[in-house]
Amino acid sequence: MRKRQKRYGAALALVLSVLLLLSGCSRDFPEHFLQTEGSVQPTEKQYNDTVQLTENDIQQMSGGKALFTYIDQGYVTTLVGKYYEGKIETYEDAVSSLNGIASLIGLSAGSEFFCVYGETDPMGYTYYTFQQKYGGLTLQYATLKVVVDPEGHAAGLSCSFTPNVGIAEEKTFISAAEAERIVRQSFPEPEYRYYTDFTQKSAVTYNNRTVECMVVYTSNPEQSVSFDMPFIEHFVTYAGEYLTSVPTSSIGSEISDAYKTDDYFKGLTPATYTGAVTLFDGSIRQITVPTAYNAQDGQYYLADLERKIMVADYAAFNFQNGRLDFVTTPDNQGWDGNYLITYYNYLLAYDYYADMNIRSIDGFETPILITVNMCDAEGNPENNACFYGINNGWACFGSSQVNRYGEALDVVAHEFTHGVTRSAMQGTKYANETGAINEAYSDIMGNIIEMRAGATTDGAWLLGEMCGETMRSMSNPNTYAQPAFVGDVFYGANVLNPGRYNDNGSVHTNNSLLSHIAYGLYKSGMSLAEESRLWFTSIELITPLSDYDDVYACLLFSARINGLEQYADTITRLFTEAGLLGNREQTAYAAARAGCGRVEFSVSDALAQGYDFVSVYTTGQDGSGVYQLSVCPDVNARVSFLLPAGQYMLVYAHVTQEGLAYYGYHPTGWASGTDGLAYVQVTDGQTVYLNDIS
């Protein structure tokens, strides 16, 4: 069981909800600065006087077993090994340990960062997680983790800090009076009463980012009859922008949760529901789930008071300023079957991570909101399932009524893992390699959770097979249009401008690269319990910008931590076979598969910076085109991909603000329109070079 240290939990709450209170209040964890000449006495050791270690020094300290990965600028992003001679017993010691490797990781004098939390795992390793700040703002994707072994020595670190940012100018905050004026402009109605004595500096998680702001309290003219929420918190950014508002039950200067979501669970009485749910295949499952009774309105809620989970309507919460229309019945009967099975599986996913002492998505019991009836702003149902961040104090998940994804524990646990990884990494860069890695972790942990729960008989590591809609195969990725190695058929290269037309850089396609390795470890003899420890510990090690080289290093690090070093060679072999180590661009260009040939052409730099893509078709029996796959120009403005030998038709889609413009490959080359397309003959082991597009 993983133990998250309670005193660091307070720091996490501060990061997510209250960074700076009014004068007189202090933090458990103040910000930290590497020492500079202007901030220390001459007799104290200064950053510039600290002897900087080299990779060779660290190798000697680590008995020749240290491992390093780097970003393009040459700074270390993952370090596995001892880099500090002193003992690390506190987060302050962890900060001190960085002085000697500042040049390796790009920490310049004046680098500003703060401790988010600390935790100790079952093996006795302690992890200190920091985030970087600049000019009063938390930098996106900037996370540093210091790992300490059971004896108190530095065991390694991972870092996605922005290197050499320097010292920011002092930031000016808007006044309390100005914040109140902005709120009055947004809510001029006279029935709002303002509690000016309690206006204060704060921070909230908004659109998955920590935003520092002023919080203004007013009365709540539209107080719910179901919950006692007499006040409203209004959030105004330091730049003077009205951000959002939420109802709350109390106000005051001692705030540990700016959104007061815990208040919704107060006053409810626990209950249970037992009943039958009809699954997609017509089979019946008996389930028992917690519910709750609200004496104020006489309704039963689909809610778990112990785990702090509630179920509410997606549209109201997302399109009506966070309104909470909870799912209720008057008699604890008649619950929607899809709601029930989805809720039930989220409880199972919650409990799996809770057994590792990760309660909720973060280990600090952030309340969970399962929003049902997913739709767009016009009310059209969306065929999806998702985790969409922490919003208004809730860890939010979306569920649809037009699919049965909630019946599949691997799909539900996939989404739950998105929340866990986002919290562990302190952010997610959901694009290209980092996005595919994020998706892969969700697939891997989702499948492990499902298999360990006995919720499937699948041995091929499929995703979604228990809801009648299998989406992926981790044992044979090509079956569901995914690559098994870098440059394989269906592989999507990194793109300059990730977006919806290119799946944010093929995040739902290339995720098979890592999940296929997880399956390979399983087939090599690693048990599900061992896989769970290996991958979960690596989640705690990686950062939002960790690429495949970093993940490889962190998996080897995790193997050391968990006593699984006998699998180190297997991990190395599988990563090598997948082409995930080193220059992946060149690996993709040179990739080959028996029975396949290559198609290649270039586009202009301007087109490569857009969202363009190429669709590939074969000819059906009726002569119509049958879609096979799509590829996009890569970061080098090249389109280069493998196809099985055969005849194909290609259509280039140019994305503009007005829509899509299509250019087919004709006998004379690329031209507007899709009639009269030429067949491109792909031959085994050969490359077909097509005309470039500008």
Name what the model sees in each region:
Residues 1-39:
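Gram-positive cell-envelope targeting signals
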Residues 25-412, 419-694:
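Zymogen propeptides/activation segments of proteases
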